[in-house]
Curated annotation (Swiss-Prot):
Pfam hit, one: Cut8
Subunit organization: Binds the proteasome.
Protein name: Tethering factor for nuclear proteasome sts1
This protein's GO CC annotations: cytoplasm; nuclear membrane
GO annotation (BP), single: protein transport
Family as reported in the entry's similarity comment: Belongs to the cut8/STS1 family.
Name of the encoding gene: sts1
Record localization: Cytoplasm; Nucleus
Top-level taxon in the UniProt lineage: Eukaryota
Statement: the UniProt record of this protein carries the keyword Nucleus: yes
Keyword Phosphoprotein applies: no
Length: 312
């Protein structure tokens, strides 16, 4: 039976290899992808892949770090705390802020000068707006119905009327020389302040009109002071612009002649206006002077005058 089973033939070189290398262990080579030989087409593909990949150190593809978001961290412990000064001032309106400053100046008198020098200079429009606010308060204080010129109405509006007159007395010196050096600002303020005085109520009782007459007297003195100061600057050229002669004459008419002294001062300063009568019945000399003045302002003076040539 054994003779019938044939053993597979073994090549003779296999036995020779086993006999020669039996003294040392034979290591079987392990297959790795990198150990095999690469073909020419593999080298070309690998080269193309390396060329297509951009290096990480290329300046055109330098990775940029995104800016970190400055997010406020949540406070671990939530507790109440007062507002900071800037946030507190944002919640105050004009009246509340004015009250805070007034209270601080009363408790610390040394702050008065600092506040005065730090605060911006009030303009003509802002000052007149304050006076108009007092005027609106006065008008709203009149009782409904009845006689608005009676003693009862006067007693009802006496305090708002006093507040308006006090504010007028405080603001007027601020816009007078030498505190105000620009005559145009002084004239504009006096124009608006005089209109407010015109709107003051007239009372049946003459004694109640003393305050109104005093206001006209003070504003007339202010007009005279500003006119004299403006006449010293540029030969009174500031008074000739804006039609101040007509405005002052109208104010004098609305006041019942209480500003006549200011009208006379303006006429004396200009030299061509001598009161309201001469405006309607002006002399030929006054008209000639006014015509010359208009020619000087328009730049046409002397265009038709012949010029002599040669010895005089």
């Amino acid at each position: 039976m054994n003779s019938l089973v044939a053993t597979p033939p073994v090549p003779p070189h296999f036995y020779e290899y086993s006999r020669l290398s039996s003294s040392r262990p034979m290591s079987t080579p392990t297959y790795t992808p990198n150990s095999r030989k690469r073909k020419a087409d593999d080298d070309g593909n690998d080269h193309d892949g390396r060329m297509s990949a951009s290096p990480t150190s290329s300046p055109a593809f330098t990775p940029r770090s995104l800016p970190s978001r400055n997010m406020k961290r949540a406070r671990p412990n939530v507790s109440g705390r007062p507002l900071s000064l800037p946030r507190l001032l944002e919640t105050l309106d004009t009246d509340a802020l004015r009250g805070v400053l007034r209270s601080m100046c009363e408790r610390h008198p040394g702050l008065v000068d600092e506040v005065v020098h730090t605060a911006p200079r009030p303009s003509v429009s802002s000052a007149l707006q304050v006076l108009r606010n007092y005027q609106s308060t006065l008008q709203s204080s009149f009782p409904l119905g009845g006689n608005p010129a009676s003693d009862y109405a006067y007693n009802r509006v006496r305090q708002p009327l006093s507040n308006l007159l006090d504010a007028l007395s405080d603001f007027t010196p601020h816009f007078l020389p030498p505190n105000e050096i620009q005559p145009s600002l002084s004239l504009n303020y006096l124009d608006g302040a005089t209109e407010i005085i015109h709107a003051l109520p007239r009372w049946h009782t003459p004694q109640n009109n003393i305050e109104r007459d005093s206001a006209y007297d003070e504003i007339c003195k202010a007009w005279i002071l500003v006119i004299r100061e403006a006449a010293k600057r540029g030969g009174g050229i500031q008074l000739q612009y804006g039609g101040w002669d007509q405005k002052l004459a109208k104010h004098n008419q609305n006041s019942g002649g209480k500003l006549q002294a200011a009208v006379n001062e303006l006429g004396a300063s200009l030299g061509w206006m001598h009161g309201p009568e001469t405006q309607s019945h002006a002399s030929p000399g006054g008209n000639d002077f006014g015509s010359i003045r208009e020619q000087l302002l328009s730049g046409t003076y002397g265009l038709g005058t012949p010029v002599k040539v040669g010895p005089w």
